[in-house]
Structures are given as structure tokens and as C-alpha cells.
Amino acid sequence: MNLKEKTRALFAEIFGYPATHTIQAPGRVNLIGEHTDYNDGFVLPCAIDYQTVISCAPRDDRTVRVIAADYDNQLDEFSLDAPIVTHDSQQWSNYVRGVVKHLQQRNNAFGGVDMVISGNVPQGAGLSSSASLEVAVGTVFQQLYHLPLDGAQIALNGQEAENQFVGCNCGIMDQLISALGKKDHALLIDCRTLGAKAVSMPKGVAVVIINSNFKRTLVGSEYNTRREQCETGARFFQQPALRDVSLEAFNAVASELDPVVAKRVRHVLSENARTVEAASALEKGDLQRMGQLMAESHASMRDDFEITVPQIDTLVDIVKATIGDQGGVRMTGGGFGGCVVALIPEDLVPAVQQAVAQQYEAKTGIKETFYVCKPSQGAGQC
């Protein structure tokens, strides 16, 4: 049973009538452009074929009822006429409530909804299960009530909900790629203007995601520290964001900056340049150049931004040794664990999977999880 069939069957069973719509929104992997989004820079993610699926129907009153199929069919019920506040015990509910609360502030022309939610985006792996949920919920209301909101607005609404209601400080990339993703393409996103350019992926190339299964612990506190260091760097250059600082300007005065801040700034500036170049390398089908840029990105995250861990570096080394210059591999996501992403010819996937299976656990004591993904379509009816 796929997610659509599962949620539709559950909807009929629990609510006693059939769902009218089924909506999906995908997770994502970022191919290159790490910690650039909150510096108003560029990112190059693609949506993946793991998603949140919601079967739903409009109600003729002001009640929202939500079933979380992946959490033992837990129910959340709230009214659109009362102030929407956080749920005491069900964290998943807060993503739904936050999206609805912020939608009300954007466009209040909607009524109640019944929905059943299920997803297969791995949680805690840095593949944006939360953004996928936020965009799916926003799309449900937009589709059921024909709200005049485009994908970028649904994405922004999800980001606001996560920042202000859930209380997690995220950039805009995850929601934007979930809303706007395009099949067989990556998206070069300008995080300042929210402009997005579809970049075709070379034929016969697999997007491989390998979860290190190293439990991320530092991610919240260290993420916020990195943001502060970047803001300090932007202030030093008297610019609104590091996006506005050139590598030349930085190199001329790098020695005057706090040495740690200087390393953080150098990562962001060089990563922005790499990301823009990577988009044109992908478009040309130049997997070799893409691989070099991914390697430089990983080294920069390891040495300048200092967000990798030995387990992640080990995974990258194993993959790199197997593929040589046929493609690329790097850590992806916020850091301190999580996943690596590799772009490799499809015929090399078995060799990579075998090498990782033979070496990673032997070296780290942790068993990896291996995903082969396709660049997929963004949110909509399914």
C-alpha cells in the first residue's frame, strides 16, 4: 500500500466518509550550498521521492481535525475561531497548528478541514521531514479553499510557522524546494529574492543519500553559534549579509577579523561561488567538475565551518575512494552528523553501496542507511 492508498483508507475508516483530495510535498537533499541560505546566498537542492502525503476534505464548519498515521493515529482537533496555541504533548501537532495559524494571518478565507497525514521522509536525517509537512499542510488549505497563494508564499508560511510557532530557526531553502521542486531537475535558489532557476540533472546520474546514523546532538546550539558568527562577519563589512561581501574584499582584511569568524566567513563566501558554478556544471552535464566542487565544499565545511564529524568524513572518504572523479560526494544538511549526498553514475551505485557496507560499520561501529533517490516534483495533488 502506498502512502496515498494508506491515508485514503484510514480517512474513510476514521472519519466515515471519503477524502476529496490527496496532497503530497517532498523532502529534499541539498546538492551544494551549505549554511548559505541564512546569509542571503545560493543553494542547489533537489526534491526527492520521499514525501509527506495528506488525504483531506473540507468541512462545513470551523473545526480542523488531524490524524497522524505515523504516530499511532493520534488525533489533534482545534477550532479556527479560537486562538491557536501550542499542543502540550504532541510535537507533530505544532507543525500543523503553526502552519494554520500563520495562514490565517496571510489569508483567512478558509474553513475547517479533516486530514490524515503519513510520510516516509526519514526523520532526524536532515532531509527536511518538517518542511515537507509544513508545505503539505499549507497546500491542503490552498487547494481545498482555492487560496491565491503561490508556492513561494506557501513555503514562506511554513518557514514562519517553524521559526515563530515551533521555535526552530531555519532558513527558507527546505520549504521552497518542497513547494517548487521540479522532476529531473535541481533548483538554484537565490535565498534573498527567492528566485529559483530549474537546473536539469544529467541523464543516468543517481542521487545517493547515505545516513551516517550518528546521532546529532550539537546541532541546535552550534547552528545558532554559526549564524551569530556570520552576522558578526557581515557587520564587520558593514553589509546586510555575507551575500554582499566579495572574496577579494574579504582576503584584503581577513587578518583583522577574529580568526574563527574569518574561517566562517571564508566558508560562506567560497561556498556561494561554488554553488553558482555547480549549477552551470550540472546543466552542462560536467559531473567531473561537479565532483570537484562537492569535494571543495566538504573540505570547507570540515576545516573552515567545522561542522562535520569523523563518522561523516569517513563516509565521504569511502565513497570518494570508490568513485574517483566520476561524480562527487559531500556532507549535506546542518552538520554534526546526518547524511552525505553523492551524485554518481547509476552503474556505480552497487559498488558504492558495497564499499560502504563493508567499511563504514567496521570503522565506526555504526550501520549506515542507504537511499537512492530521484529528483522529484514539488508539492501538489497526487
From Swiss-Prot:
Active site: D174 (proton acceptor)
Keywords recorded for this protein, A-Z: ATP-binding, Carbohydrate metabolism, Cytoplasm, Galactose metabolism, Kinase, Magnesium, Metal-binding, Nucleotide-binding, Transferase
GO cellular component, one term: cytosol
BP GO terms, sorted: galactose metabolic process
Gene Ontology molecular function, alphabetical: ATP binding; galactokinase activity; magnesium ion binding
Pathway(s) where this gene product acts: Carbohydrate metabolism; galactose metabolism
Disulfide linkage: none
Superkingdom of source: Bacteria
Residues noted as binding ATP in the record, renumbered to the chain: G124, A125, G126, L127, S128, S129, S130
List of residues binding substrate: E34, H35, T36, D37, Y223
Catalytic activities: alpha-D-galactose + ATP = alpha-D-galactose 1-phosphate + ADP + H(+)
Residues bound to Mg(2+): S130, E162
UniProt keyword Zinc present: no
InterPro entries: Galactokinase, Galactokinase_bac, Galactokinase_CS, GalKase_N, GHMP_kinase_C_dom, GHMP_kinase_C_sf, GHMP_kinase_N_dom, GHMP_knse_ATP-bd_CS
Annotated EC: 2.7.1.6
EC category name: transferase
Site location (Transition state stabilizer): R28
Localization in the cell: Cytoplasm
Protein function: Catalyzes the transfer of the gamma-phosphate of ATP to D-galactose to form alpha-D-galactose-1-phosphate (Gal-1-P).
PANTHER family according to UniProt: GALACTOKINASE-RELATED, MEVALONATE KINASE/GALACTOKINASE
HAMAP family assigned to the protein according to its UniProt record, in alphabetical order: Galactokinase
Family classification: Belongs to the GHMP kinase family. GalK subfamily.
Name the UniProt record assigns to this protein: Galactokinase
Source organism of the structure: Salmonella agona (strain SL483)
